[in-house]
Amino acid sequence: MERSWKKNLLWILVRLHASEKQSVPSWTGFNILVRNDHEVVKDNVGYLPTINAPATNMSTVYEVLTKSLQIKDTLNLQSIVVVFDEALCAKATEIKWKHREQFKDLVLRMGVFHTICTFLSVIGKRFQDAGLRDVIIESGVIAEGSVSGVLEGRAYNRAIRCHKLMFEALNRLALIGFNSWTDEHHKDKKPIVDEFFKGLKALCNKTCEQEFKATVASPSFEEVSRLFGSYMHYLRHGNGKLSKFWMSYVDMVETLLGLLRGSREGDWELHLSSISEIVPWCFAYDNLNYARYLSAYLHEMSHLLEEHPDILEYLRSGGFSVQMNEDNPFGRIPVDQTCEETVNNDTQSSGGTKGFSLRPNVVSKFYLVAEYRSTFLRQLKDILHINWSSFQHKDLQPTRIARDESDVKSIISVLQNTWLNPFNPDLRDLVCLSTGKVATPNVQHDLLQAKDVGEKAYKAFRD
């Protein structure tokens, strides 16, 4: 997690110290640019037969697991990985535990895409009434009619972008205080900090992997990141309750970005450490299904070295996510998200099966040929260049870069000039950023101790 944190910090510093007309893209675009020397190998996505039965039936899940073992044998594999969302993973886990010998060569994984959606809802639930909802509406980042979908994790792309912008805005506010804090407590380090910011111009002017690696490896950045880490610790524990509460937002979004980065870069260790950070929050906010089965998932993954070393090697090589685009070095996505964008998208029909027939034999035929129809549809789209374009991620487009910068500045303006800056040392009580209403002692205790309560529940569940 520390390497991911340093990369995110450097991104924020580069964005903050770029030219007056912002030229450095937001989080995803920046990481694409600083991985320009990485070799990209596109993965092939295959379409499997469709089972004409309710997905949530235990018999259906059992059939999926059985078919997976048949595929393993056909491909002469030692073991095979099957990815489910939480609802199906719970049933599959129960079946595997009941028939351990039969399914000993099968490894179950929890879908990362659906896990992210759940964590987005946890973040929204914790912060929406503390001022987050009002801030993103007032700043114009999210329209009032769309804000519920963002905070509940249903509007995935908008939610991710919203939290990236809020995360960057809060870090910029923290950096304002960091400069004065450094002058007061670490005057002897001021020349090193100034030297780093002077050298940062090279990365601002030429955002590429070579410059990025050189900056990360520099002693001056190591010292700046250490100092900023100390200042963030002060904001968490020595700057009042309001600062502590909103630093938990920064930490939660840091975890969210770590989970995204783990999938996009194929970093298995970062993926596991991010999941372990999410579990206590699921316990704290009563998302018990994910809390229980993510705990089981972490336990299973921690024993892969003894039980399935071949699978562990495959996952460490990035096999737990899928490279859909051959031009994007930061473009791997979770397996369950890949299914949403390929299999589900190509298999669906207008109105479902009821849209063309209610006759059982016709519906049965529809499902029997679904894999072939979907495969041919995907090939036809590729031939006709439907949904195809020369690669340029939208975060790299000048209009999006300008819009992102404008939205970040708008959030900062709302917090500094209209409402409350959560890192203001004069604000010691836990209050709503937009209304200034002080939380009751019971509410303060619940909010500030939420993660500790979640960690205790997680420990009790494991024991």
Predicted regions and their residues:
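Long, low-complexity intrinsically disordered regions enriched in Ser/Thr/Asp/Glu with frequent Gly/Pro
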Residues: 1-463
